């Protein structure tokens, strides 16, 4: 849908540009995460304001921005719509997301049992849990799913087996984009997990980080 406009953007890589290159581009506005404006990255917002460059930090990227919610993503989109004088388009994007949420709710209203979901990322010795304060967790709850291990930060494989989730979402970070199957195989082919019902039924799903962390317009992909 946006291929033509996207092709006109000077830089679209996953790696953040360095300070010198960013300044050479002479931006009017920098839109980023809280981490974008750290001293060792692109300097502080004050640094840019003194040079006449405006800044916008995504709400959910703030260190204390918990819980991270769909409502915050909607607000960011609407605020950017005001900045770029694209209010109607911003409202349309938010409306599409809300429509998807309402669609899921209406089609699961008759379920006697809510789908039980576990959202994990493999890092360190134990999988990290995306719990009740994460955007991914909020999406699961907004869609009337039951979020498992919602108060935990990590989880052992034995507990995963005990929970027997209806679906496991595996978060794929930028380092593994294009290698989603390798991430899925960490569950599907793991000797301790391969007999889970959700594995046998093909309900282990790759979830790109860009769709569930400070995701803005890409939140639609996370909801879908």
Label the predicted regions.
Residues 1-25, 29-37, 148:
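A short, structured surface patch at a secondary-structure boundary
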Residues 7, 50-52, 143, 200:
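Short, structured coil segments at secondary-structure junctions
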Residues 8, 129-156:
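Alpha-helical, coiled-coil/dimerization segments enriched in small aliphatic residues
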Residues 28-29, 166-169:
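Short, Asp-centered acidic motifs that coordinate Mg2+ and/or phosphate
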Residues 29, 43-123, 150, 202-224:
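Extracytoplasmic substrate-binding proteins
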Residues 36-50, 171-187:
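A ligand-binding cleft/hinge motif common to bilobed small-molecule-binding domains
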Residues 40, 99, 106, 154-159, ...:
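Alpha-helical scaffolding within the catalytic cores
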Residues 54, 186-203:
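Short beta-strand->loop
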